[in-house]
Amino acid sequence: EVTLIGGEAYLFPGWTEIVRAIRAHGMSCAVVSGGQGITEESPRPAAEAGVESLSIPIDGDAATHDRLRAKPGAYARALAALRHARLAGIAVAVNSQINRLNLHQLDAIAEQVLAHGCHGWQLQLTVPAGRAADEPDVLLQPYDLVELFPVLARLHAQLSAQHVKVLPGNNVGYFGPFERQFRQSLRCPNDASCSAGRSVLGIEANGDIKGCPSLPTRGWVGGNVRDHRLVDIWERSEALRYTREHRPERLWGFCGTCYYADACRGGCTWTATSLLGRPGNNPYCHHRALDHHARGLRERVVQREAASGEPFDHGLFDIVVEAIEPRPAFVPDPHPSTEIST
């Protein structure tokens, strides 16, 4: 599968010819869009060219979504985009980031996923990259995962029962009690910690190749397809072979001593790099949060250095390990057994 992302892919002149070329080479084609410029007419050429699926972000209720997207009216336009695409015959899906602004709105997002006939819902944690790098208070703290994951497991079960694929992203994990449920479609459910350079690659607009489209450009480009064959970049580039060729010495901090180190390999490379400047130590791990919690501890990330302002930029954070103090937990899952209705 080839997924066209942006910016907005449909703003590129002749982008439907790219879709046709993808389909002519025997690959399926999906599009991820912000959903802000999609009219009733615009999905029709995409459907005719062969776009099979369109994914639109829904990041909470109207106020939260518009705040996160920094665009008044973005929520209404995103929902309209889902409706327009379905009318054109394109299957639709929703993707959502999870952070402290929408942590308690996941049930409401799930209702919209069902109401708009979506075939899938991808979930990932907000990472401090791009605009999010400038708003550290929006991020979840690692200890929030202890209470978040049971909610995700309940929603996964409820939507799966209604034939909606709930797809936790590569930075939602790892090795906790719900991992097999989340990754049941994989041959090895615990092999989903990072797909970069293993089952995924990213092609930037200028032809640069990365193991994952989310990774920063600096340090993670393995070559350019204008200069080298894609297969040569894939096989020979150190940047793309990083997760394929596991070396225990690359792991550090908690991940370096973890029981699951060899299988997990430090979790999502993008998340760790965006937080700490290098991969190999990822505090956003369910097993890790549970391990600390059982010992009366928790981890907190604190921004040390602001982002530079460049594309794919990120700041730097420190990890603080501290005792769990009495504090109001964020609102627990209020509906542990409530079924979502269409």
Go through each PLM region and give its residues.
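C-terminal accessory region of radical SAM enzymes
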Residues: 143-182, 208, 213-259, 265
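Short, surface-exposed amphipathic charged segments that create phosphate/polyanion-binding patches used
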Residues: 138-139, 181-186
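Radical SAM/AdoMet-radical enzyme domain recognition
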Residues: 1-144
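Short, P/G- and charge-enriched loop/turn segments at secondary-structure junctions
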Residues: 185-190, 244
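Short, small/polar residue-rich loop motifs at catalytic or cofactor-binding pockets
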Residues: 194-198
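Radical SAM enzyme core and accessory elements
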Residues: 163, 204-212, 217-221, 225, ...
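Residues that scaffold the ATP/ADP-binding catalytic core of kinase and kinase-like folds
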Residues: 41, 64, 68, 212, ...
